[in-house]
Amino acid sequence: MSRRGTAEEKTAKSDPIYRNRLVNMLVNRILKHGKKSLAYQILYRAMKNIQQKTETNPLSVLRQAIRGVTPDIAVKARRVGGSTHQVPVEIGSAQGKALAIRWLLGASRKRPGRNMAFKLSSELVDAAKGSGDAIRKKEETHRMAEANRAFAHFR
């Protein structure tokens, strides 16, 4: 156990246009090689595409997509007596959001298409509707946790 105090949890800053922490978290995950302005550009173009596709508030679509992809439970590898078991573990809201964002971006990067803004907007709209690769990933994680329910006492 650390002799120092516990580290304070950093609160995410909000972005300049939507004034939303979730948007800023997404921008920070899109970010590659320190090019934050490009990450903002990609996300804002994606939001504009969502606005044109759905004719609703893109922020509500984003929230709905992340809420749909956020897992409640995941599996964690735990070594017990020489064999490794996949132990189901409940996930907190912050970690769940982070996983959801990671899965959404991973799924949108894998999509075939012209540019990242287009792929991201398509994935967010699909996730908000309840389909897409990110939703499939969440369901797969939940299935894994359900299949390994017998090892829940190893926590």
Curated annotation (Swiss-Prot):
One of its GO terms (molecular function) is rRNA binding. Belongs to the universal ribosomal protein uS7 family. InterPro entries: Ribosomal_uS7, Ribosomal_uS7_bac/org-type, Ribosomal_uS7_CS, Ribosomal_uS7_dom, Ribosomal_uS7_dom_sf. One of its GO terms (biological process) is translation. It comes from Phaseolus vulgaris (Kidney bean). This is Small ribosomal subunit protein uS7cz/uS7cy. HAMAP family: Ribosomal_uS7_B. It comes from the Eukaryota.
